[in-house]
């Protein structure tokens, strides 16, 4: 039976490259001269430290533009709350969304059921497998899911016929 998997993955090398480019741009920009802004990657978290809210927003804008240039979807970023750090610094933690949570997988499964196509979806750890008798039905499911705004970065892999 034809099938495919729905996954949510991020290329960590590209994330590292985007962060390095962000740090480089912050060091070169005139409006950041003399400020103590930092962007660091710790496993699946990006820590942004800035002098004030304005600079924090500017750093996050730079980071997002670098992510987009490196073909990393902004939907794969989950923003934490901006909080006061030591002194007058502001800190924000950005979490990389890797894998599909059970709740999101159920939501995607519900969207697939609403299409009323003859396909089944199974939740497998942090991914979702969709199987069906007809390849055209599977392609229709992919088209529908790409059209929906599910606030998650999805890739469709292992398309088998």
Swiss-Prot record:
Any matching Pfam family: DUF520
Function description: Nucleotide-binding protein.
Alphabetical UniProt keywords: Nucleotide-binding
GO cellular component: cytosol
CDD domains linked to this entry: YajQ_like
Designated name of the protein: Nucleotide-binding protein Gbem_0619
Record-level Gene Ontology MF annotations: nucleotide binding
Similarity-based family: Belongs to the YajQ family.
HAMAP family referenced in this protein's UniProt entry, alphabetically: YajQ (MF_00632)
């Amino acid at each position: 039976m034809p099938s495919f998997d729905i996954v949510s993955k991020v290329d960590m090398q590209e994330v590292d490259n985007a962060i390095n480019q962000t740090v480089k741009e912050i060091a070169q920009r005139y409006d950041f001269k003399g400020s103590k802004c930092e962007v660091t990657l710790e496993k699946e978290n990006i820590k942004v430290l800035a002098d004030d809210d304005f600079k924090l927003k500017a750093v996050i804008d730079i980071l997002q533009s670098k992510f987009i240039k490196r073909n990393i979807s902004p939907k794969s970023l989950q923003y934490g709350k901006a909080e006061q750090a030591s002194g007058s610094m502001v800190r924000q933690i950005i979490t990389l969304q890797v894998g599909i949570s059970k709740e999101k997988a159920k939501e995607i499964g519900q969207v697939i059921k609403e299409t009323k196509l003859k396909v089944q979806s199974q939740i497998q750890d942090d991914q979702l497998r969709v199987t069906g008798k007809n390849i055209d039905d599977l392609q229709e499911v992919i088209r529908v899911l790409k059209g929906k705004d599910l606030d998650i970065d999805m890739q469709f892999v292992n398309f088998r016929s």
